[in-house]
Each structure stands twice: as C-alpha cells, then as structure tokens.
C-alpha cells in the first residue's frame, strides 16, 4: 500500500457545509474510489487555519490518478468549488506532503 498525505483549503465560512457534503459522500463516488484501489481515506479540518489535511492509502499511483478522469469525480469537484479554492479544471488546490515519519 502507498500512503499519501496532502493539504487543501476550505473557505472560512464553509466548514460546516464542507463536512455536511462529506457525510456521507455520494455512493457513486465511494464506489469509484474503492474500485480504483483507495483505502483508509480520511480528511481532517484545522478550523483556525481553514486547512484540510488528508491521508489516504492507495494500491497504485496510476489507479489513484485515474480517479480524476471519471465523470463522478469531475462532478464532485464542480460541486465543491463554492466551498474551497479550485484550479481551472475544478480540482481542489492541494499540496502533497512528504512523509517524514511512520510507525507501523
């Protein structure tokens, strides 16, 4: 399993809405993530800094990257653009983090 972590931002007035939209996520999005080898995906909110910290385990980078081209992912990204900064393709602005410690 490959562990990944990344940070995103959420608009200051959208914390509750962001959480509402994820509980639960669309069943079809969950199905796409699972079918693409995504496991143990968690997102945490730092309210003071409007930061989202995400951790995920994936089976392969290729399958993880393929999620972005699915119709359901494209619709999800568009759905989320009013609650968080987005790139021109509607993907969330994010920065990948480097793992510096892991205790199995």
UniProtKB/Swiss-Prot annotation:
Keyword Isomerase included in the entry's annotation: yes
The protein's name: L-rhamnose mutarotase
Binding site for substrate: 18, 41, 76-77
Complexes and interactors: Homodimer.
One GO MF term attached to the UniProt entry: L-rhamnose mutarotase activity
Gene Ontology biological-process entries: rhamnose catabolic process
Pathway linked to the protein: Carbohydrate metabolism; L-rhamnose metabolism
Organism: Shigella flexneri
InterPro entries named in the record: Dimeric_a/b-barrel, L-rhamnose_mutarotase, Rham/fucose_mutarotase
Entry's localization field: Cytoplasm
GO cellular component: cytoplasm
EC number of this enzyme: 5.1.3.32
Record gene name: rhaM
Keyword terms: Carbohydrate metabolism, Cytoplasm, Isomerase, Rhamnose metabolism
Reactions mediated catalytically: alpha-L-rhamnose = beta-L-rhamnose
Family named by the database record: Belongs to the rhamnose mutarotase family.
Protein's job: Involved in the anomeric conversion of L-rhamnose.
Active site annotation, chain numbering: 22
